Amino acid sequence: MTVSAFDLFKIGIGPSSSHTVGPMIAARHFASQLQAAGLLGATQQLNTELFGSLSATGRGHGTDSAVLLGLAGHEPDRIDPDQIAPALLDIRSRQQLALLGEHTVRFVEKEHLLFRRKS
């Protein structure tokens, strides 16, 4: 069995890739599933809830940012690091999120991205 360095290490946004890569991929996958089911354009609101360690360390470890970027269609190993801050500023200041960069929904982070401390 051969193991490459790419199997051991994943490229992603930080400061904690363990709290960003998975959530970013999962958020993008969710939006992609909406698109595949023909529901992306009909989506009017999106609520996200984080639990466990993602909730406990989320903001400090960048999980919130990763979820927003994933829903917007970005991938952890493909996003230009120089575009992260402007993309997040755009989402947060306009309080809108373009799912997969295609369909815009109202997204007020304090209402629509919740950190659940207890399950």
Regions found by a protein language model. Name each.
Residues M1-S119:
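Fe-S-dependent hydro-lyases/dehydratases of central metabolism
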